[in-house]
């Protein structure tokens, strides 16, 4: 299951393990297309935690990580950014990215 993140719990959410965060906005078409892909990944890859943060409602993490385009996906390992991709990516691409850092 993909979890919804807020500015308040962002740091604790990414603090440990492998975590993929989707920076999105409700009005973003590619962001909406990414949602079912992330839901599938969450079900198939139990070694990664997946979360989404709405940048319109929670701007601080987007500013901190200099997110200027959406969707932006950032992969964190124990709180540190290890990979970043911008734009709509398919399931195979994201699976390979996650497994590369597992």
UniProtKB/Swiss-Prot annotation:
GO terms for biological process: cell redox homeostasis. It comes from the Bacteria. Residues 1-102 form the Thioredoxin domain. Disulfide bonds join 28-31. GO terms for molecular function: protein-disulfide reductase activity. Keywords: Disulfide bond, Electron transport, Redox-active center, Transport. Pfam families: Thioredoxin. InterPro entries: Thioredoxin, Thioredoxin-like_sf, Thioredoxin_CS, Thioredoxin_domain. Coiled coil: none annotated. GO terms for cellular component: cytosol. Participates in various redox reactions through the reversible oxidation of its active center dithiol to a disulfide and catalyzes dithiol-disulfide exchange reactions. Belongs to the thioredoxin family. This is Thioredoxin. The lineage of its organism: Bacteria, Pseudomonadati, Chlamydiota, Chlamydiia, Chlamydiales.
